[in-house]
Amino acid sequence: MSKQILWKDSWQAIPRSFGRFIAISLLMLLGTFAFIGLKITGPDMRQTALDFFKQNNLADVTVTSTYGLDQTDQQTIKDQVGVRQVTFGYYQDAAINHSQTSIRVYSNTKQISKYQLVSGKRPTKANEIALSTSLQGKYKLGQTINLGHTTELKNQKFKVVGFVKSSEYVSRTDYGQTNVGTGQLSGIAVTTKNAFNATNYNIARVTYRATKRMNAYSDRYNEYTDDKKTQLQTALNKLRAPKYQNYQSQITTAQNQVTQLEQAASANPAFQTQLSQAQAQLTSTENNLKNLGYPSYTVSTRSSFPGYSVYRSNSRRVDVLANVFPVFLFIIAALVSLTTMMRFVKEERITIGTFSALGYSHRDISLKFILYSIMSSGIGVLLGAIGGFTILPQIVFKAYAASSTISGLQLHFSWTYLLIVIAVALCSTTLAALYALRKDYQEHPASLLLPKPPKAGSKILLERFTPLWRHLSFNYKVTFRNLFRYKSRALMTIFGVAGCVGLLVMGIGIRDSLSGIISKQYETIIKYDLIVAQKAAPIETESQSYQKLLNSDKVRRHQAIYTQQFNKIAGSDQSTQTITMIVPANQKHFNKFVNLLSPSGQELSLPKNGVILTQKMADLLKAKKGSQVSLKDANGQSHHFKVMGIAQMYMGHYLFMSRSAYEQSFKTNYQTNAQLVTLKHNSSKQVKKVAQSFIRTGAVTTTSLNLENQQLIANVINGLNTVIVVLIAIATILAMVVLYNLTNINVSERIRGLSTIKVLGFFDREVTMYIYRETIILTTLGILFGYLFGYGLHAFIMINLPPDNAMFDDSMYPLNFLISTIIPCLITLGLAFIMHRKIRDVDMLEALKSVD
C-alpha cells in the first residue's frame, strides 16, 4: 500500500499545529539548556583549573619559616618520603613608590609553581621585575617602580618588563596580609634570584610522586597531601628548639663581646665607637628575636593558597544548584510535553480511525506521531544541548572569572548528560504518544471515526453542599463542574504553575539571601573597621607613635584584644577550617565592636567559663550548648573548649572568650596582641590610609581590613547572582510556555462547547471568561502551592549551597512572593488577550460540525 498520503499527512501535522510544535520544542530546549548547562559547568570549571595547575606544575606543599630555611631545613624537606621535586626561593614584601599598593616579590622559579607570562617578557636581570596581572591597569611595561628600602632586596628601583599569572594565587583580589602598606597585599611580583640579599631561602615548594596521577580536587588527593603536611610539620618542628638555642648562643656570644669591649673601652677610649656599634647591634638582634619569637614553620597545602578553595567552592556551588533547579525544571517541562502529546493523539482520533479503516497498519499510523514527537523534542534537545554545552558554562564562568586568575574556560562534552536528556525527551513525547495510541488501537476503526463519548454525568463534591451550590451563579457552576470533569488537565495546570512559581520563589529567595549577607555581617554583627596586630616587642618610639594614632581624632574607639588562630578538619570535604579566637580585654564595651547574637536574635554576653562559638562552625561540628570541642593551634597542639553559647556569623569561623575563661583554659596570664579599631570616617580611602599609618608606626605586624573581607564576599555573591538571574529568566520563560501550552490545550478541548455558548448568544468577553475563569482559579492554586514548593527548595539550597566557612541568610521576604506572583499573573493576563482573539475568531459552524 502506498504511504504517500500517510507521509504527507505526517508532515502537514507540523504546520497545522505549529504552536504546539514550537511549545514542545521550547519546553525541551529550556529543560535541556538548564540541565546540561549547569551540570557541565562545575566539571568544566574544575578541569580548566586542573589543567592550569598541571601546566604550571603547582606545588603540592609549600614551607616557610620565620627564621628562613637553612641547610638542615632544606635537607629535612628533601628527605621526606615520596618527594618528587623540591625548589627553594626567596620572597620579600614591599610597597610600590611608598603608596598603599603592597606586593610580595618572589624569586623566579622554573620548575614548580611556574609563572605564566601574559605580556612582555620574564625578568632576566636583577633590576627587572614582572608584576601580577591584577596590577596591569596601574602600571605599564617599561615603567620604573620604587620598592623602597628593604634589606632583602639589592635594588630599590625596578623596571617593569612583564605581567604574569601565578598558579599559587587563584584569586585576583585576595593576596593575603603583609606588614607593609595597608597591611593587605595588592599583588605579587617576580624577579631574579640575584636581586635578593638573603643568605637563607625563606620558601620551599614541594611536589610528590603519587600526586601526579591524582585528581587535585579529589578527596584522595586532599587526604594524601594533608598526611604529608603532617609528616613534614612534625619533622620540621623537631628543628625548632636547636635553631632557637643556636640564635640564643649567638646573642650570648655577642653579649660577651660587648662585655669585653666595655672593659677595653674603660682602659682605652678608642674602643668606644666599636662598643656603641656592638651594643646597637646586640639590641637590634635581641628585639628582632623577641618579635620573631620561637622559631615556627608553616607547612601549607594547596587549600591554603589564596583563592584555591574559593574557586573550588564556587564550582561546587554550581553543582548544588545543578542538582536542584534544572532537575525540577526538566521534570515540569517533560510532564507538560507529555500532556501535550497525549492531547495531540486525542485530537487525531478520527484521522487514526480513517487510516485504520483504509488498511494502514498500527505501525504505519504510529509513524506520524513518532515523527512529530522526535522532530519537536529533537529540535529542542539539539538547540538546548548546544547552548548548554557552550553558552551557559561561559556565562557562569565569566561571572567568576572577574575575581580569578584562571581564564579561558575549557568546554567538555558529556555523553552521559546528553543521553539522559534524550531519554527523558523520548519518554515524555514519543513514548507518551505511543501509550495513548495503544488505547485507540484497541478500539474498532468504526468507533474511532466517531468522537469519544463523554463520561457519564455525576454530581461533584461541591454540589453536595446545597446551600453553597444554590448561591453560585450559572457561570461559576459551569466552571466548577468543568474543573472536576477535567481533573487530569486541572492537576497538570496546577503542577506546572506551582513548579514555575516554586522555582521563581527559590531563585529570588537565593538572590535575597545573598544580598543581605554583607549588611548583616558588617553592620549588625561586626562593627569595627580593622584589626591591628601588634609587634611582640616594639621599641619605645614605635609604641609612642602607635598609641598616638590609636588616640587620634581619626579613631572613634578601639578595644585591646588577644587573638589566635586554630584549625579543625571538618565540613563536607573534610578540609581544614580556620577559627579565629578573640578575647577582649574589656568585656563591658565589647558589644560596640562585635554584637554577639544567638541564632534566634537574642544578645549574648561572654561567659566566665567556656566559649561562644559561631553558628556555622557549630553546625559543622554538630556542637550545641554544653558540647566539648577540640581545636588545634598552629603548632598542632590540641585545646579543648566547652561551648556555652552559639552566635550568628555569616562569613568565617570565630570563637569568643572572656578574659577569665582564657586564663582558666590556657593556664597563663592574659596579654593583648591586637586592637579592634572603629574609625570616625570609614570610607574605603580613609580605612586604607589609616591602616597604612598603623603599619608605618613600626609597632604593627599586620592589619586586617573589613573592606577586603567584604570584597571577597561580594565576589562570591556576584558570581552566584549571575547564575540566579539566568535561572530566574529560564523559570519565567518556562512559566510562559507552560501556561500557553496548557491554556491552548484547554481551549482546543472545549472548542465545541465554546462554539455552542457563542451560538446561544454569549458575548465574546463572556465566552472568554467561560473558559478563562478556570485558568485563573487553577493559576491561583498553582501559585499558592508554588509558595510551599519554593519555600522548601529555598530551605534545602540554604543548607547545601554555602561553603563550609559561610552561612547564608535564610529569611524569605514578602517582595519575593509578590514578584513570584506578579510574573505568572502578567503571563496569564497576556495569554488572556491572545486566547480572546483566538476564541473570537473561531468558526462556530465548522467547530460544531467537525465531529459529525
Name these PLM-found stretches:
Residues F474-K608, Q615-K616:
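Juxtamembrane segments of multi-pass membrane proteins
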Residues D9, P15-S17, L335-I374, N721, ...:
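Interfacial "coupling" helices/loops that link adjacent transmembrane helices in transporter permeases
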Residues L338-I350, I374-I406, W415-Q442, T743, ...:
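Small-residue-rich transmembrane alpha-helices
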Residues G19-I22, L30-N57, L392-K398, V501-Y528, ...:
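Alpha-helical transmembrane segments
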Residues M1-F33, I370, S458-G499, N746, ...:
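N-terminal Sec/SRP start-transfer signal
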Residues K39-G42, D79-K125, V161-S166, T563-E603:
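The feature marks short, hydrophobic/small-residue-biased sequence motifs that occur predominantly
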Residues L117-K193, N202-I203, T207-M214, Q602-S660:
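Hydrophobic secondary-structure segments that place a key small or acidic residue at a functional site
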Residues T41, T48, K54, S107, ...:
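Peri-transmembrane interface segments
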